[in-house]
């Protein structure tokens, strides 16, 4: 009589999520107990931990690493000398991911010739635009393309029907890569088409981040996909053990169809992204669809990731479609990726370059604001030289402490002339920049330490493309729905100021 409820009870408490959380919590508790037990009254242990923090500080000073990231960790180790060095080794150091690094670097090097910048593709760009494009081609290894149409979507529910139509038309390949995949209306619609296409012989592959999707997928998800002939990789699987590589998440959002059509942006495969589920008011997001030669960059981006973990092919030429007989003349489209496993901060540099070249305006969508002094100075200096710099952030947060951290940056920016808005209808999740009617970026890259330094990310740089104006118009249409923040709104109590200081200190961990 009680058997069914008991089975349901134990299946609920013994699922993968619960086991992972409980075991990690026990490990953290044990480490804290060991830390306090060893340090209490043991001068030599305290001295050893302080020496470790000092050595890590010296290591960071000499390391070829982004200055904002280094300063954040050095400050933390200075304030917490007993814990700082150990925290850096656990959560900040990229070196432990050697196996991950070697796999990805080997594939990237093997396929460098698949992405070579052709001079005619950047013809017509002015000096500053050419400089931005050249940087991405040389250091990001992703070239610029002409002959590509782009379409900007101002929300997930506008993008979703077009995505389904494109998936239905797939004839050869469908490559899907997302940080979050959750069961629900959005995923059900995509999955039904993927299953049908796989049954028709289309090469269907899926990469999803195991941490991002942990709460939203059944434990046998991979088995189900493979049975449906959908090849599947859960990236960096979450295990109930404290691991130094768990920081590195696949935050990218990519769909590539037949090598000709690609999608990216902030939209994941979960119901809140198309407002089929209300979590934090209206979910404001953005996405970009490209069709044409530039989709090849996303094809290589996906295949490099795929073959690093599940080697399938050494020659990508079969996935490259023929050039269109009807070329599109709509500026430059330049997809790019950023990896935490090298020393080149591609995503941050693209943002800094946009600020440096701006003459009239820079409009920014970002759900989070947790950046270093270099980015803060760039924002302030642009405003001080007369550029209309506007930041749009959420009015309803998804993470309250991170929201408080974001707000802690408001005052110095406002004092420099940056204008800041909070989107009052709900949560703004878009990650977009647009400047001077000339250039724009749409992608997965937040303005925080995790996106800029720890996650795998992607985006698209548009120059002299019609969708630059579409993004500009979207921002201008969104501003009346926002509350503009003024200096008088930033007053806080002494305890609040102390809390903000602590959050800023801990920002590399958030």
Where are each of the predicted segments found?
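Catalytic-core elements of nucleic-acid end-processing and repair enzymes
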Residues: 431
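Glycine- and other small-residue-rich loops at beta-strand/loop junctions that grip anionic moieties
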Residues: 179, 368, 402
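Helical hairpin unit composed of two closely spaced alpha helices linked by a short loop
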Residues: 358, 368-390, 394, 399
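Exposed, interaction-prone extracellular/peripheral surfaces
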Residues: 350-354, 374-388, 405-408, 414
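Active-site donor-binding acidic/aromatic loop of nucleotide-activated sugar
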Residues: 420-424
């Amino acid at each position: 009589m009680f058997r069914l409820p008991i089975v349901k009870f134990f299946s609920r408490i013994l699922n993968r999520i619960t086991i992972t959380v409980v075991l990690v919590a026990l490990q953290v508790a044990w480490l804290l107990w060991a830390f306090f037990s060893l340090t209490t009254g043991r001068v030599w242990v305290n001295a050893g931990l302080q020496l470790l923090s000092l050595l890590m500080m010296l290591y960071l000073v000499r390391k070829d690493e982004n200055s904002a990231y280094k300063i954040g960790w050095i400050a933390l180790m200075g304030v917490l000398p007993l814990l700082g060095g150990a925290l850096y080794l656990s959560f900040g150091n990229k070196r432990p991911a050697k196996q991950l690094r070697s796999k990805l670097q080997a594939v990237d090097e093997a396929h460098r010739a698949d992405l070579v910048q052709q001079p005619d593709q950047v013809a017509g760009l002015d000096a500053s635009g050419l400089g931005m494009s050249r940087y991405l081609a040389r250091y990001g290894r992703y070239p610029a393309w002409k002959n590509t149409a782009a379409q900007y979507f101002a929300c997930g529910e506008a993008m979703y029907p077009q995505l389904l139509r494109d998936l239905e038309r797939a004839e050869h390949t469908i490559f899907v890569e997302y940080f979050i995949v959750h069961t629900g209306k959005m995923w059900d619609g995509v999955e039904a088409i993927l299953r049908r296409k796989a049954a028709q012989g289309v090469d269907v592959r899926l990469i999803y981040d195991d941490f991002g999707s942990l709460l939203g997928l059944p434990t046998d998800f991979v088995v189900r996909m493979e049975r449906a002939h959908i090849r599947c990789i859960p990236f960096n699987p979450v295990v109930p053990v404290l691991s130094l590589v768990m920081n590195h998440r696949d935050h990218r959002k990519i769909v590539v169809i037949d090598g000709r059509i690609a999608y990216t942006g902030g939209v994941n495969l979960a119901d809140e992204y198309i407002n089929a589920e209300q979590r934090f008011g209206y979910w404001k997001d953005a996405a970009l669809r490209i069709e044409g030669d530039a989709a090849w960059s996303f094809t290589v981006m996906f295949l490099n990731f795929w073959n690093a973990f599940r080697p399938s092919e050494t020659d990508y030429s079969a996935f490259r479609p023929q050039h269109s007989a009807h070329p599109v003349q709509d500026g430059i489209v330049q997809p790019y990726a950023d990896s935490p496993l090298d020393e080149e901060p591609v995503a941050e540099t693209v943002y800094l370059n946009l600020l440096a070249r701006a003459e009239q305006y820079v409009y920014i969508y970002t759900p989070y604001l947790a950046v270093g002094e270099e980015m803060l100075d760039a924002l302030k200096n642009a405003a001080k030289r007369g550029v209309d710099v506007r930041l749009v952030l959420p009015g309803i947060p998804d993470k309250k402490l991170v929201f408080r951290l974001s707000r802690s940056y408001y005052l110095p920016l406002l004092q420099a002339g940056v204008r800041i808005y909070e989107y009052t209808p709900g949560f703004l999740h878009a990650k977009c920049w647009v400047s001077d009617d000339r250039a724009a970026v749409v992608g997965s890259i937040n303005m925080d330490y995790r996106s800029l330094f720890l996650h795998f990310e992607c985006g698209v740089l548009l120059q002299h493309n019609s969708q630059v104006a579409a993004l500009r118009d979207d921002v201008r249409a969104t501003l009346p729905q926002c509350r503009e923040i003024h200096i008088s709104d930033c007053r806080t109590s002494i305890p609040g100021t102390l809390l903000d200081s602590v959050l800023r200190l801990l920002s590399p961990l958030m």
